[in-house]
């Protein structure tokens, strides 16, 4: 398994009602399955609170989902599959802060695996609400192809969406050059 350190008992916990920061992750596979996740961030901990996981979603349906969440929560950004041009245009037109998904599947998987491990307080940095059933199912079945050693590109949409979000949050934001400090 790609995430063999995922354990239901450890990682599946009810999400809190509120968060310090709120993000949406989106793996948009066009006519294939789309995974949209509502993520709460508290300190360094990421908590997937809700999910929509469906094949054949129109962009208008994706937008309806994200806009409904935005009426409930102050969404800081939507981390989107970098290849999903059309939905990114719709999100920007609606005023959302659109963040391209980071590149590098293997490096991203390493980051997610590290954050599934126990943190300094003994708890993992990634938690999943029990309502996110598709994400849980994918985490328990996402595997490497024994012939290629690469992740199998099937039933991986929630895992990809999670990876985009987690890697974005794990990537330090470059600081502007400060001339006053010279």
Each PLM stretch: what is its role?
Residues 28-29, 82, 157:
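Generic detector of well-ordered alpha-helical packing
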Residues 34, 76, 159:
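Residue-level detector of short, conserved catalytic/binding motifs and their immediate flanks
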Residues 34-40, 163:
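Short beta-strand scaffold segments in enzyme catalytic cores
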């Amino acid at each position: 398994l790609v995430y063999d350190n995922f354990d239901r008992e450890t990682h599946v916990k009810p999400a809190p009602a509120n968060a310090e920061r709120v993000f949406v992750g989106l793996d948009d596979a066009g006519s294939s399955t789309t995974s949209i996740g509502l993520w709460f961030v508290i300190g360094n901990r990421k908590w997937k609170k809700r999910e929509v996981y469906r094949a054949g979603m129109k962009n208008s349906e994706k937008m309806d989902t994200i806009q409904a969440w935005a009426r409930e929560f102050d969404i800081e950004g939507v981390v989107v599959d970098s290849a999903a041009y059309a939905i990114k245009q719709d999100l920007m037109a609606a005023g959302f802060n659109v963040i391209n998904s980071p590149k590098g599947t293997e490096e991203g998987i390493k980051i997610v695996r590290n954050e599934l491990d126990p943190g300094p307080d003994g708890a993992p940095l990634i938690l999943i609400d029990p309502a996110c059933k598709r994400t849980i199912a994918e985490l328990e079945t996402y595997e490497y192809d024994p012939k290629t050693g690469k992740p199998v590109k099937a039933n991986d949409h929630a895992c990809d969406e999670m990876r985009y979000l987690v890697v974005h949050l794990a990537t330090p934001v470059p600081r502007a050059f400060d001339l006053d400090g010279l």
